[in-house]
Amino acid sequence: MSALQRTPQPASLAERLADLAVDALIDEADLSPKPALVDRCSNGAHTDLHLGLMHSSALSLWPTFKLMADAAAQFQAVGEPLREALGRLGREGEATMLRTTSGVNTHRGAIWALGLLVTAAALDPQDCGPDAVCQRAASLALIKDRQVLAQNSHGSEVVRRYGVMGAREQAQHGFPAVIRCALPQLQRSRAAGSGEQNARLDALLAIMTTLADTCVLHRAGLEGLQTMQNGAQRVLDAGGSASLAGRRALNQLDQQLLALNASPGGAADLLAACLFIDGLEPALGPVSRSA
């Protein structure tokens, strides 16, 4: 049979999950207008980030997410061997990201969150409802990676200083900001006819109403966190991003956060996680487990 007559092979499960994870990162970056975050309108509160860099970073992580899904197929169960494989792949993915961005941290938190969720989905693709996937991800996150020394990241310092739940704890508790806030708001706004982009903005704002965003705390302390949470709630109370009053409140929140140099990067990572989970069941369909 000639090459022209060959039937294309269907994408493997690992490839579909990697596609979905990268799509979630790109969709989060493109969503506009987000308060003080990189989007199609501006670079937000960042001087070292722009939309093209976010896209390049997301695309560079596709092999990492695929290998994580492959690891789930190899080990087939939550446990230390799979957890340590994920840790190694995550560190390698972070190194790839930093090479791509010339040292700028674009998606470190997203590698953690989406890496866990990709792996959790790959462990049981027949049971990919939000609660099930997040609970499997939590079980993985609770296992200590023995190859990692004590962390001194900005996020870990903020967690120690303020006693809040950081990215690690968010995962270990099954992503409550996604399950309890983002996904329900996404569904409510869709049902209200807000349009997909506004529904996603509302989901981001729902996360921001309760999240102790360590990126905001690092940059602007408790004042910044309170500004973020209260401002996001005002947008939703005004009718959400689809309403005129909500858009005015959203613009005001953007200006307030920019004045504080506070960018809700933790909320952005969790929105990407929300979009990944939201797209799981529609995207998987019949899959091949072959690599």
UniProtKB/Swiss-Prot annotation:
What is the similarity comment for this entry?
Belongs to the CitG/MdcB family.
InterPro entries named among the record's database cross-references: CitG (IPR002736), TriPribosyl-deP-CoA_syn (IPR017555)
Gene Ontology terms, MF aspect = ATP binding; triphosphoribosyl-dephospho-CoA synthase activity
Superkingdom is: Bacteria
UniProt protein name: Probable 2-(5''-triphosphoribosyl)-3'-dephosphocoenzyme-A synthase
Which residues constitute the signal peptide according to the record?
A: none
Q: Does the keyword Flavoprotein apply?
A: no
State what this protein does: Involved in the formation of 2-(5''-phosphoribosyl)-3'-dephosphocoenzyme-A, the prosthetic group of the acyl-carrier protein of the malonate decarboxylase.
Q: What PANTHER family does this protein's entry cite? A: 2-(5''-TRIPHOSPHORIBOSYL)-3'-DEPHOSPHOCOENZYME-A SYNTHASE, TRIPHOSPHORIBOSYL-DEPHOSPHO-COA SYNTHASE
- EC numbers on record: 2.4.2.52
Catalytic activity as recorded in UniProt = 3'-dephospho-CoA + ATP = 2'-(5''-triphospho-alpha-D-ribosyl)-3'-dephospho-CoA + adenine
Keywords for this entry?
Answer: ATP-binding, Nucleotide-binding, Transferase
Q: Which HAMAP family match?
A: MdcB (MF_01883)
GO biological process terms on file: prosthetic group biosynthetic process
A Pfam family hit: CitG
